[in-house]
Amino acid sequence: MHRTAVLQLLRAHQSVAADPHEQSMAAEIVRFVEAHSDCLLRTCAPGHLTGSAWIVDAPRCRVLLTHHRKLGWWLQPGGHADGDPDLRAVALREAREETGVTQLRLVSSAVFDVDRHWIPPRGDTPGHWHHDLRFLIEADPAEPLVISDESHDLAWVELSRVSALNPEDSMLRMVQKTIGRG
């Protein structure tokens, strides 16, 4: 499995990330990718890579969030790499599948944000880490939304209201970056 492109993306992001905690997470993810040749597969026991889409409207006032069915949290769309080393393509694929939005524009080929978060055990799946690379994507809020089986709901949320739905540091960091303060 080819991990060079993933490592290049991570190292480039690590060098420009302003937040010390995010820099530290990027370094942890680099070490994880270097240590696990199967990091792009769900079968990688300690965790695996995921790609997420931080979908904003053109004026950068709203973000499209999904109310995740399994986790019960409002989050950005995203999902497992399932062997695909092109995490930009993973983020775009997951965004289309989870929102029904087809007209998505990758704002930058660079990583927008990274996060490392614990996924609790569920059924036969043990707890594990998601090492998430997030990409900034633009969409038109007028395009119809289609709620997938993975979601309870979808909503375009004013950036000022994101913290009321999900006060996690990583969500607030992406809000701050979107409004130009991070």
Predicted regions span which residues?
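Short low-complexity stretches enriched in small and charged residues
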Residues: 8-9, 20, 53, 61, ...
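Predominantly extracellular/luminal regions of secreted and cell-surface proteins
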Residues: 1-28, 99
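N-terminal strand-loop-strand
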Residues: 40-76
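Unchanged
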Residues: 82-170
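Short charge-dense sequence patches
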Residues: 1-7, 38-48, 85-88, 123-131
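Charged phosphate-binding loop/patch that engages nucleotide di/tri-phosphates or the phosphate backbone
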Residues: 166-182
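Acidic, metal-coordinating catalytic segment for phosphate/diphosphate chemistry
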Residues: 15-52
